[in-house]
Amino acid sequence: VPSNTLDQLLVQLDELKRDFDRNSRARILKILAQLERRRFADADSLSRFHETLLFIRAYPPSAQILRRVEKILSSFSTRVETLSEAGADLSPLENVEISGVSGTFVEDTFSYSITRWLVLRHPSQVSIDWEAHEDEYRLAATWPRFLPLLEEDALVEANVPYLDWLHAAKGRGLRDLGWLIERFERLPLAEKEKAELYESLKLYVRWELGDSRATRTLMKRPVRKIFYHTKPLLRRSDVSLAREFAEPSIPLQRLSRSQGEAVLNLARETSTMRYRELYGFTHGDARRVFRADIGRGVEVFLMGVPPDRRLPLRAYHAGLIFKNGVPACYVEGLSLFERMEIGFNIYYTFREGESAWIYARVLKIFRQLLGVTTFSIDPYQLGYENEEGIESGAFWFYRKLGFRPTLARVVKMMKAEERKLAARPTSRTPARILRQLSEGHMLLEIPPAFRSRWDKFQIRNVGLAVQRRMASRFDGDAVKIRRASVESVTRALGVRTKDWSENEGRALEDLALVLALIPDLARWTKDEKRDIVRIVCAKAGTAESRYLRLLQRHSRLRDAIIKLGS
């Protein structure tokens, strides 16, 4: 190694992490040995080292290098403690892109569901940061539910010692957060009402990570066999979606409930420590978790949500993707008929990996599992009001995979930019142009999908149509429109719901709001009406995949919904 200054060693290691020849492997080992002995004086350098190590852990060139990387990672809690004792500024380790390092903490106003889960999963590591709490009025409004006579103080006095009241009530040996969560759990309220009440308090919860296996530093799912990289990584130009969809089906394994719960715990941990919360991880159905081994050391875990947590119209699925046991990316799919709105997110550390190939394989799994043939990318994913998407050139990532914009003005601008890039291959699209290109959705249609069928559709338009009907015919009363919609739709369909389950009744309430917008529903054929009833019941069934398959077979309902949403 020609130079052994800390910065140069870090730069060299970062440059070598994607080189897999024998000479590079030897150089990586030598640099790792030097860096392992170094004492880091600042958090920036330590975080750079940490992220490069995690990349190598996910994309290891050899078993020897992997062992050395894991040995160094196991020392990070001590390294962070050493920095702290030296008075170093640790704030770089709190950055949302690199939070979750051993020896640090994460702190946020987490949702009720995640806070309750943290208390159950990591009881000794989570606590309330009372110094960060600012809204005492919310304590006055909420705590009298489980602190008798608190109103005597809170309603009329200034500077109420709320913590004195809390500590007197909970007694010794109990932690504030655990005691409070238990009180909320005992309230005679529905789950959503408990969540709204707790979240109104805006309590900052601190999770001290220590040397927990839940940290980004140490989190790793056990794998049977590591995939070692000895050749260049697959690039986007190596990936063909058409070729992927033509390949044989990928085997899917449904996990047991306990295995599914273990995966969901990993998903919640990896998201929470990154200050993210994904609906499907927080509320995932442990009974409906599927695993797919897609090759090259990559495992995909997909999950749905239970009937009482489902969206009113779209089917919801989420996924966590591991590379050699390391969480590398996550995905979220929102589906209606054959159309899926898909959000795919590579964790910052792994964006120089095999992103395009993994993405293509995930699309194939969704196509296989759910029957979807039209994939839609939201403008935010492309860079609309999202500078990260602009900097990464997300629009071109999707365009080169075969996606197309749906807005005519964006198509015109894209074609002009493509001509410029063809004439000057080394040039880059200015950020100003990328922002304009990101203003509309992009679609990918896979045969037998009909081109342009979903170009103008937005699910929000369906919801807004319901609001306009509520305003014009029901004086803005949500209870009235729900009741009237159920009555008119069940009458039109000729169905009795006396013996329906609670979940089926909830699904009917939601779907009836939309079905009531179809003016000629009562004149549909007997078979078409029967199939709608089956669709409603499937929305409340064990798996939303059946709901989607039934929707995909109902061409008349598809046409009506597309018209409402376009």
Indicate where each model-derived feature is located.
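Hydrophobic transmembrane signal anchors and adjacent membrane-proximal interface regions, especially
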Residues: 98, 128, 182, 203, ...
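A conserved beta-strand-loop-helix scaffold within acyl/acetyltransferase catalytic domains
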Residues: 248-351, 360, 364-370, 503, ...
